[in-house]
């Protein structure tokens, strides 16, 4: 069975940076982003402005779980792709062929017990709120077609609440907590040393 490394934390915490660091020591892996499993806005019965993207129900949790389960069993999947500008799932999918290591990242991957049980190594990125907000603001404006006002509105109305209600509490499930995200050189050194030793020993996490 494939081994799954899960990386979670609030939006803008530095998950992508940590994935990049891991890639230096485990060069062959498949990356699954929970973001691709957002539901299309058209799936909701109410208008877009009322959609809460910072709630577990915003994701297609059943599909996400089934895909991780299949990958763990070394079965390929057709991963969805999410269009953040139009807020809907694209018509095309990407076939993902599993490798010995699967890295899955997302803000709420530790929320559901059934998903947690599939993850062999859980890493939580703990970054201060102000830094995360600034990173999210820059990303959403430059890459997701958002306005300054809409990002601030979303943060104050749903993102901040969702973080404290659903995301931060999942720290208790983490095997490793990395403060300051991808800029904590000491923590990343410890992680890289650990992963390097696992790689030499055949990646037996448990």
From Swiss-Prot:
It holds the Pfam family PRK. Keywords: ATP-binding, Cytoplasm, Kinase, Nucleotide-binding, Transferase. It comes from the Bacteria. It catalyses: uridine + ATP = UMP + ADP + H(+); cytidine + ATP = CMP + ADP + H(+). ATP binds at residues 9-16. GO terms for molecular function: ATP binding; cytidine kinase activity; uridine kinase activity. It is found in: Cytoplasm. Pathway: Pyrimidine metabolism; CTP biosynthesis via salvage pathway; CTP from cytidine: step 1/3; Pyrimidine metabolism; UMP biosynthesis via salvage pathway; UMP from uridine: step 1/1. It is an enzyme of class 2 (transferase). GO terms for cellular component: cytoplasm. InterPro entries: P-loop_NTPase (IPR027417), PRK/URK (IPR006083), Uridine_kinase (IPR026008), Uridine_kinase-like (IPR000764). Belongs to the uridine kinase family. HAMAP family: Uridine_kinase. This is Uridine kinase.
């Amino acid at each position: 069975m494939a081994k799954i490394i899960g990386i979670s934390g609030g939006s803008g915490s530095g998950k992508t940076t940590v994935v990049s660091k891991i890639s230096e020591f485990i060069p062959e892996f498949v990356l699954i982003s929970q973001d691709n499993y957002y539901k299309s806005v058209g799936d909701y019965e109410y208008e877009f402005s009322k959609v809460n993207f910072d709630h577990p129900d915003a994701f297609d949790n059943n599909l996400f779980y089934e895909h991780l389960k299949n990958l763990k069993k070394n079965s390929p999947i057709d991963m969805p792709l999410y269009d953040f500008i139009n807020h809907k799932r694209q018509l095309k999918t990407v076939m993902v062929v599993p490798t010995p290591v699967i890295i899955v990242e997302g803000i709420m991957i530790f929320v559901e017990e059934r998903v947690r049980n599939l993850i062999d190594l859980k890493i939580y990125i703990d970054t201060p709120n102000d830094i995360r907000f600034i990173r999210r603001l820059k990303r959403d404006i430059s890459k997701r077609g958002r306005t300054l006002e809409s990002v601030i509105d979303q943060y104050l109305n749903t993102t901040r609440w969702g973080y404290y209600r659903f995301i931060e509490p999942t720290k208790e499930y983490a095997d490793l907590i990395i403060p300051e995200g991808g800029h904590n050189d000491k923590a990343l050194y410890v992680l890289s040393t650990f992963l390097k030793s696992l790689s030499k020993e055949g990646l037996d996490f448990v």
